[in-house]
Amino acid sequence: MADLLFEIGAEEIPAGFVPGALRQLEDDLSKALADARLAHGEVRSVGTPRRLAVWARDVAPKQTDARTEAFGPPVAQAYDAEGKPTPAATGFARSQGVEVSALVRAQTPKGERVAVTKVEKGRRAEQVLPALLERLVGGLRFRKAMRSRFDEATFARPVRWMVALLGGRPLKVRHGEVTSGKVTYGHRFLAPKAIALKGTPDDYLAKLRRAHVLADPVERRAALLAELARAGKEAAGKVRDDPALVEQVLYLVEEPTAVVGEFEKSNLELPPEVVISEMRNHQRYFAVVDGKGRLKNRFVAVSATRVKDPAVARHGYERVLRARLADARFFFEEDRKRRLHERIEDLGRRTFQAKLGSELDRAQRIGAVASALARALGKDALVADLLEASRLAKVDLNTGMVGEFPELQGTMGAHYARLEGLKPEIADAIEDHYKPIGAAEELPRSDLGALVAVADRLHSLVGIIGVGEKATGAADPFGLRRSAIGILRIVIARGYHLSLAAAVEQTLDALSGVKLAAGRAVVAEQVLDFLRGRVRAAWTERFDADLVEAVLAAGSDDVVDARRRLEALADAKARPDFGSLAVAFKRVANIQEKAGGSGAAAVDPALLRDAAEKDLLAALEKVEQEVVARRAARDYPAVLRTVATLEPAVARFFDGVLVMAEDPALRANRLGLMRRVAALFSDLADFRKIQAEAPAQARAG
């Protein structure tokens, strides 16, 4: 057994490319070794902006032999009456590269056939690995790649060296004009000389560590966090928590060195989000806060190298930030010269989407939709504020500050609203209507912000789909999936019992002046189908797919209600008696579907002949009122517990009663009894879609 080590050295790879490339290297090498029939131990990747490396421990010295079996014609066609090979047999043997005498008889599902077994002897690992590694590096995919001037080889950035070692012995691997060897290189400035490697992962990491390169991202992250903690204390505060920035900076440096800098206190008069955005998004600096979380006029930059005089680096970082903050102050002061209400008409000169009109059109429609949603929820008192918040929600798009810092849309509008003395709730709604930005981001804080946020997303979703634009595959230029997920997250989190169909219709009303690419009913169904797809995708990440399908089939117009039904059903499925219950109710639903008809039905007690059907009716009458009451209260766990008490009576009914009796009156009465049972659970879930079976003892009984 020997360790395989493979490193690709390159010019600085963009930080966002590195984590994905490392995952791909690890996954692809594992699969390639398996496909090559080379046994191995741990596969792991490490990397920095200048190198991507992967290793496999304990690689077998040679491939395992491959045994393959090929089947030919039936024996009856392969040999004549005297047992001599026919042309069919000789032709098959020739196609397999063997003598006809090598053919054997083999039983197959299609009868006895001639066959040939071939064994491919495994080659030595050093013979297999060079081509395997060339495919590995050539198969790496990046959002953008560069091509060499001299050949077709591509990579994120120009490849400068490669290392390929098996048990310390070099393998010859080529990528473009670069051929692998056994030397790597340390830090570009602190240890640029070549470093000879022994080929083990431990030797690789240790030698690079001495050369000022922490190749392992886990080790480098720990060093980065330690540097940030040290620098925070030096700055008489602490570095503001920012996991996303830590992850980004992690792949910008090979050995992190923190530098504390300072900016003028007067810049703290700017909204803190402006200062933080300038530091983190434009300069990759970490903000420093005091014990109460308030921004200090200090920052921490992470240098990719160590310098003899830290003051030189500090002054450089401060100079860049000083200029950027001066620009921010200028935009802030200029923006304050006009009130938000004075900017509303400016939205008419800003296009939202060519077929959907201006941002002013958009703002007016958002207000109409938000008001309709509020009335549907019985929140009429919010309508005036909703209209005001909707008018102002997009106004900051025309400010200088948002023009310079697009990531602060909504945030700056909220700041300006507060400075102008507008209602705090309206200011919060202006900021919150962009939330959630991502799948795990925070949600709007109030009904006001939540309803404007939902209305904004509904307008985008219905409008964009309505004019014929759709999300296809990986392409979603208008963020339709994000809009749909945002709607669902807000509605469920706030417990809004909204009809999605009605909400879509209300949005189409607001879009009445827009020319739709299809009929109104067609557009409405396209939007609802898109929303249902997002519901299905989101819920199947957490719940069993069959339960999700069962619940959605019973109704998904009110997603809050559907989610509660799903959670109750998932809890019920975890109980040992669920299999029997699901099987019984599935049978009830199947009978009802075949017989036609739905809903509750009258049952004539006088036509009940068997004890089992009389018992079932008695059991039904005991629970029907309770189920109706529990269902009205949306207490679905209680509904399922109550309905579950019917399972023994339903099982006995099916064991002893013929539902489809020859007597039409008996048959109709028994089908009515089935409809009465189905009426108790059919609006909870379609049990026919649930994958379940009764316990073995129940089936045996």
From Swiss-Prot:
The protein's superkingdom reads Bacteria
Going by the UniProt record, its keywords in alphabetical order are: Aminoacyl-tRNA synthetase, ATP-binding, Cytoplasm, Ligase, Nucleotide-binding, Protein biosynthesis
One Gene Ontology BP term is: arginyl-tRNA aminoacylation
GO MF terms, alphabetically ordered: arginine-tRNA ligase activity; ATP binding; glycine-tRNA ligase activity
* Reaction(s) catalysed by this chain's protein: tRNA(Gly) + glycine + ATP = glycyl-tRNA(Gly) + AMP + diphosphate
- UniProt KW Ligase keyword: yes
The record ties this protein, via InterPro entries, to: DALR_anticod-bd (IPR008909), Gly-tRNA-synth_bsu (IPR015944), Gly-tRNA-synth_heterodimer (IPR006194)
- Where's it found, cell-wise? Cytoplasm
The cross-references to NCBIfam families, in alphabetical order and at most eight, read:
glyS
What does the similarity note say? Answer: Belongs to the class-II aminoacyl-tRNA synthetase family.
Q: Know the name of this protein? A: Glycine--tRNA ligase beta subunit
